[in-house]
C-alpha cells in the first residue's frame, strides 16, 4: 500500500504482520494478551530504514487489553524487623505494648458505687457472684434502685443513705434561725426587753401623777426606790403618761 503526496517514497506496511514482533511482544509482556489488530496497530507508523513516523494516526480504535493480577511484592510472612528477630514469631501488624493490669481475685474484690454508704468498720461484702447491675442516675430517685450485690447488707440501701442526708427544706423547718436568709425574721434589737409594770406599781405611779405631773430628782429617786424600779423607768412612765393625757384632752370635744 502506497501513500500519495509528500510521503510517496515511503511505504506503510501496517497490514503486514511480522511474526518477530509478535514473539518479542509475547516474551517481553507475558501477562498481556494482544490480539491481531493490536499487533497491527503497534506496527503502524514504522517506516523501513528511518525514524520518520506517519503524521496521520491509524483510524482504527485500540482494543481494550485484559491484564492479569500480579502477585504481591511482599509476602505475608515479610516483617519490617531484622531477620535475627524471627519473622514467624511476630504478627503481620504491629500492636503497641499495653501493660497488663492487675486483676484481684474474687475473694478480695471490692465493688463499691459512690451511692453506697461508707464501709462500717471491717465489714466486707461476701457471697457475691461478681456481676454488677446497671444503676439509675440520681435524677430518678423515685424509682426502685436494684441491689448491686446479692450479699449486700440490708441496712446499706442507697435509698436509706440518701434519706439520711440533711435536706434544705427540712433543715429550715427544724431550725430556721440557723439559716442566714431567715435571720431578719428573728433579728434581735439592741433595746432591752419590755417589762410591763405590775398592778401595784401602776397604781402607785398613777397616784403620784395625780398629785404632781412633774417629779423632782429627789422625789423620782424615792418613788423608784419604793416601787423597786429604776429612775429611768419612772421618768419614762411619767413622760408617756403626760403624752396620753395630752392626747385625751385633744380628743375631747370642746363645749
Swiss-Prot record:
Signal peptide stretch? none
Q: Where does this protein chiefly localize?
A: nucleus
Q: Which PROSITE patterns match?
A: HOMEOBOX_1 (PS00027), HOMEOBOX_2 (PS50071)
What the entry lists under Gene3D superfamilies is as follows: Homeodomain-like (1.10.10.60)
By its UniProt entry, which Pfam families does this protein fall under? Answer: Homeodomain (PF00046), Hox9_act (PF04617)
Q: Which InterPro entries match?
A: Abd-B_homeobox_TF, HD, HD_metazoa, Homeobox_CS, Homeodomain-like_sf, Hox9_activation_N, HXA9/HXB9/HXC9
| GO biological process terms held by the UniProt record | anterior/posterior pattern specification; DNA-templated transcription; embryonic skeletal system morphogenesis; proximal/distal pattern formation
Family designation: Belongs to the Abd-B homeobox family.
Provide the protein name. Homeobox protein Hox-B9a
Q: Which species expresses this protein natively? A: Takifugu rubripes
Encoding gene (name): hoxb9a
Amino acid at each position: 500500500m502506497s501513500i500519495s503526496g509528500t510521503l510517496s517514497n515511503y511505504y506503510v506496511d501496517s497490514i503486514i504482520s511480522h511474526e518477530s514482533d509478535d514473539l518479542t511482544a509475547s516474551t517481553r509482556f507475558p501477562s498481556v494478551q494482544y490480539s491481531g489488530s493490536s499487533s497491527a496497530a503497534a506496527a503502524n507508523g514504522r517506516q523501513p530504514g528511518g525514524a520518520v513516523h506517519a503524521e496521520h494516526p491509524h483510524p482504527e480504535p485500540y482494543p481494550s487489553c485484559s491484564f492479569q493480577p500480579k502477585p504481591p511484592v511482599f509476602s505475608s510472612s515479610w516483617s519490617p524487623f531484622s531477620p535475627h528477630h524471627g519473622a514467624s514469631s511476630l504478627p503481620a501488624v504491629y500492636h503497641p505494648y499495653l501493660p497488663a493490669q492487675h486483676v484481684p481475685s474474687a475473694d478480695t474484690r471490692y465493688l463499691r458505687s459512690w451511692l453506697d454508704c461508707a464501709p462500717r468498720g471491717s465489714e466486707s461484702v461476701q457471697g457475691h457472684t461478681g456481676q454488677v447491675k446497671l444503676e439509675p442516675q440520681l435524677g430518678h430517685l423515685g424509682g426502685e434502685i436494684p441491689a448491686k450485690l446479692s450479699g449486700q447488707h440490708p441496712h446499706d440501701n442507697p435509698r436509706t443513705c440518701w434519706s439520711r442526708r440533711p435536706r434544705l427544706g427540712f433543715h429550715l423547718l427544724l431550725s430556721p434561725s440557723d439559716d442566714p436568709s431567715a435571720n431578719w425574721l428573728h433579728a434581735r434589737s439592741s433595746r432591752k426587753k419590755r417589762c410591763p409594770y405590775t398592778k401595784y406599781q401602776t397604781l402607785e405611779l398613777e397616784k403620784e401623777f395625780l398629785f404632781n405631773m412633774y417629779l423632782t430628782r429627789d422625789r423620782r429617786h424615792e418613788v423608784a426606790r419604793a416601787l423597786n424600779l429604776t429612775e429611768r423607768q419612772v421618768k419614762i412612765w411619767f413622760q408617756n403618761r403626760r403624752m396620753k393625757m395630752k392626747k385625751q384632752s385633744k380628743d375631747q370635744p370642746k363645749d
